[in-house]
Amino acid sequence: CRGEGEIVHNDAKRGDIGNTSAMYARTFLTNMDCDAVTVAPYMGEDSVKPFVMEGKWVILLALTSNYGSSDFQNFPGNESAFDERHPEHDQLYKYVLKRSQKWGDHGNMMYVVGATRAEMLKEIRTIVPDHFLLVPGVGAQGGSLEEVVKYGMNKDVGLLINASRSILYASSGKDFADRAAREALSLQQQMGKFIS
């Protein structure tokens, strides 16, 4: 059950062949009635399209905040990697941002861009100026909330900033609910300060 105005995001990070993706999409977005689901787009359009539904959000992994993301996401393109259909031979995450915009629009597709890569948000905003960005990595992973807002905000704010561990592990004692609430409120107040 959810309160009015609350959004349910299933951070499933799915991505499979078309038929299997269709089953995942139906399960998460229809049967479970989630509002959004995170999808790994690296199997291509047919793995993402089943998640593109009216009134729902597909959130594509683009540039994640984890250490190993540079193994693939920052891979520099070259002629052998990306053919003539993409002459600028971008890094993989940029190619994902550009290519995937053909599969949905800013009303049903957003992107995961880690706060630990805040300096890259300025360029990312030139590629996806109107899309929401889900930004994990503020808090325990060391991402700067101030830099995320500075470089990632668009005319409509356009940011969903996530800080999981700093809230989930605020305390292991009986005061967990109070400490987690204080941590969440503190983050919200910091966001308000940077946005206004």
Regions found by a protein language model. Name each.
Residues 12, 16-112, 130:
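Conserved anion-binding
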Residues 46-48, 67-72, 119-123, 142-144, ...:
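Short acidic/glycine-rich loop or secondary-structure boundary segments that cap or lie
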Residues 1-9:
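Alpha-helix-loop-beta-strand connector modules within alpha/beta enzyme cores
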Residues 25, 48, 97, 121, ...:
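Generic structural signal for well-ordered alpha-helices
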Residues 147-158, 169-196:
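C-terminal helical cap(s) of enzyme catalytic domains, especially alpha/beta-barrels
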Residues 21, 44, 89, 93, ...:
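Generic structural signal for well-ordered, non-membrane alpha-helical segments
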